[in-house]
Amino acid sequence: MFDDRPQHWMPDVISWNKYFGWYVGAIDDFGGWLDMMHKKHPDTRIGVSEYGVGANTQDHSLNPRQPNPGGQFHPEEYQNLYHEKHWREIERHPFLYATAVWVAFDFSSDGRNEGKNPGVNDKGLVTQDRKIKKDAYYFYKANWNSAPMVYISSRRFTQRTEANCEVKIYSNCESIALLVNGKNYTTIDSSDHVFRCADIMLQPGANTILATARKNGQTFSDSCTWNLSLPK
């Protein structure tokens, strides 16, 4: 709200903490804000010193909507969507001199009571105890790390009540072979390290999801199990 205070534009460079889609506005506002600030101040180097949203690895949603930051439901899938879209905008705006994900690890924050974790800021890509790397961690790994990898997102969303779902995979390989319950389902290509396959039909009971890729003559794979229990 204070973007255009004159004193902010005295230095040669400036960075902002911006939380579009969390504390203010919507996720898709981020790109427009970058365009606006660069148009107004083309000679000032602009950075983003913080961006991120909270996620509890036990909270999940097929169609995540923007949560209440101070509420108790912080689905991992919304954090995934947020970082996918923000990183896409960061790549699209080369005038940014620096950006920083907020934050690497969940951390103590005494005044908070949100995301089912009292006293914790849950914007980390890794849980506070360092034991669980959230899905968004692997999104950035697919984008930033050259070591071949395949990772099925929403893997902790194990208990399903809807048969029709999407499988989304993060990988730095060129194509992914998707198998569902041992049967070849499809081969997916992607140019942005996010591989999607919609309208997957789960069967009642346990469903094995297997994603496989080839790179440099080697095979890389990941798997998870989703259990479907249809409402009676």
Question: What is each model feature region?
Answer:
Residues 4-11, 15-232:
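Substrate-binding clefts and catalytic carboxylate motifs of secreted carbohydrate-active enzymes
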Residues 1:
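Short, surface-exposed recognition loops and adjoining beta-strand edges that mediate ligand/DNA contacts
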